[in-house]
Amino acid sequence: MTAKMDALQVVARGKAEFIRTTIPELIEGHAIVQPRHVTLCGSDVWMLSHAPDTAYPFPPGTTGHEVIAEIMELGPGLEGHEVGDFVLAIAPDHRAMAERYLTPQQNLLKLPAGKTREELLMAQQLGTVLYACKQLPSVIGKTVAVVGQGTAGLWFDFVLQRLGAAKVIALDPKSNRLQLAQQYGATDIINIREADPVEQILGINDEKLVDIVVEAAGRESSINLAIELARPDSGFFLQFGVPYEPINVNYGRIFTKCLKHKSIVHANSEPGHTSTLQALDLIAAGSLNVSAVLTHRFPFEKVLEAYELHQNATDNAVKIVIDMP
């Protein structure tokens, strides 16, 4: 009889269901892991509610990709790990919202000692931010704006100030997230609901727009705001936030301002997962205290409530942890 497991599956736009599905078959060079903690991010919301119509339904296990897991079985040829080890499991296919997940050896990252599993789980997204920052021009002495202060934006604040930015200006409509931004390295904060962000930037930065702007929200309004904040001729615009759906972007402004523009995705395909390993080391060493962003926890059976909370960003939610069965 084929073994079964519980899993979530995004079956239609805005609709996910609990299902029973077949446990993956163990193959050479892979491990079967049991996800223990999963956190949600903007790309999960995109898959749930904003992917192209032709993408639905997604496969079983969708959608979860920030995962701490326990190794349950080792396939032939897999070395360096033992059954019972806890790992950060890289899940680029977003299919880890399930009781079991099949992972190749290169996507099993050992956890350093000294921090909780939930804290170390933040290394997955922090790693994507480190990877993105490696694509930026030098930020030493520069003024950088970060539009969007979810956890990705907060990690940008932290990394950019460590890289030597003279000013890190955090923008968001939520005051609780702006308070966190100050904890994580922002030199200035702007609540975009309370003041004109362009005027505020000019006031902060000697009547100049910023050298570099990072967009970390993926909304139409935030992307167009980021374009406005970048300095003409020399400004650099990094698009990190996942656009939720086809949007109207003022490309004419990118063109007439002669901006340098780069989008960044697929950090999980970085050879050796170097940036994610660096993120694990930063958290383990205490260089970054991630505990302040861990605001909510849900059991697996209430994951649909967690998605709703994440999508609406109510109750001062920042990072939501799902405790798997």
Q: Which residues make up each language-model segment?
A:
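C-terminal hydrophobic helical "lid"/dimerization subdomain
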Residues: T2-A7, N224-E228, T276-P325
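Glycine-rich beta-strand-centered segment in the early N-terminal region that forms part
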Residues: P24-T39, A51-D93
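Residue-level recognition of short, solvent-exposed, well-ordered loop/turn junctions
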Residues: I27, E82-V83, P104, V139, ...
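A structural motif shared across PLP-dependent enzymes of the aminotransferase-like
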Residues: P92-P104
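Mid-domain Rossmann-like dinucleotide-binding core that forms the NAD(H)/NADP(H) cofactor-binding site
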Residues: E119-E194
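Glycine-rich cofactor phosphate-binding loops and adjacent beta1-alpha1 units
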Residues: V139, T187-K260
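C-terminal substrate-binding/catalytic core of Rossmann-like NAD(P)-dependent dehydrogenases/reductases
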Residues: L202, P246-L294, L304-E305
